[in-house]
């Protein structure tokens, strides 16, 4: 799978051949087909593996930052900053973005798998609402608002300006301001 990931990143889904993947992995083409069936299935396995690493990272951030009893503003800010400073710069995230941004002909992850980090955050927001920490009759919408005001805006800033680092004050200010806007709406 490492060989396939490297070639899908370097060549794109369309141009990466099973022959080239097999050669890079130092196995026969038949071995690749025996293990994965077809190139599309191999591509999806690569994307799923990278997605799994992202899910673990987001789950850890949720479990360690959005803890019961912690000041909500501090918790949300710490969570947003952790995702922006640790997940965005990670090679797993960069790989995931590059693989999933490929042409429409590349196989897509199932929506349920692709949206797993968002669902985990929605579940935590449902707990926050049930505990009275936020006023959110629709925790799914609240999680989307939070993400849009913080993580998505920070990602846009990082994507728009390649010279901006995840830990720079500009990026961290986006998170803090987004948390404050979110709390004004949901507290």
Question: Each PLM stretch: what is its role?
Answer:
Residues 1, 73, 77, 81, ...:
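An amphipathic alpha-helix signature
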Residues 3, 7-41, 45-49:
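Helix-turn-helix
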Residues 3-7, 86, 149:
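Short amphipathic alpha-helical elements of helix-turn-helix/winged-helix folds
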Residues 39, 46, 50, 54, ...:
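Hydrophobic/aromatic residues within well-ordered alpha-helical segments
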Residues 45, 58-93, 142-146:
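Hydrophobic alpha-helical connector segments
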Residues 55, 74, 89, 95, ...:
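Amphipathic alpha-helical packing segments from all-alpha helical-bundle domains
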Residues 75-78, 86-108, 155-160:
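Amphipathic alpha-helical segments used for helix-helix packing
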Residues 129-178:
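Hydrophobic/aromatic-rich alpha-helical bundle segments in the mid-to-C-terminal region
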């Amino acid at each position: 799978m490492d060989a396939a990931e490297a070639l899908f990143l370097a060549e794109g889904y369309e141009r990466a051949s099973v022959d080239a993947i097999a050669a890079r992995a130092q196995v026969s083409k038949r071995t690749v087909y025996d293990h994965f069936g077809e190139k599309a299935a191999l591509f999806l396995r690569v994307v799923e593996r990278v997605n799994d690493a992202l899910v673990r990272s987001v789950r850890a951030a949720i479990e360690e930052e959005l803890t019961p009893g912690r000041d909500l503003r501090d918790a949300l800010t710490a969570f947003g900053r952790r995702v922006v400073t640790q997940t965005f710069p990670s090679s797993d995230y960069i790989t995931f973005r590059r693989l999933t941004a490929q042409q429409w002909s590349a196989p897509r992850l199932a929506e349920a798998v692709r949206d797993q980090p968002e669902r985990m955050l929605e579940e935590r927001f449902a707990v926050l609402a049930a505990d009275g920490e936020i006023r959110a009759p629709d925790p799914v919408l609240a999680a989307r608002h939070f993400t849009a005001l913080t993580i998505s805006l920070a990602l846009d800033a990082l994507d728009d300006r390649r010279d901006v680092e995840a830990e720079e004050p500009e990026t961290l200010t986006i998170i803090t301001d987004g948390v404050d806007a979110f709390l004004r709406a949901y507290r």
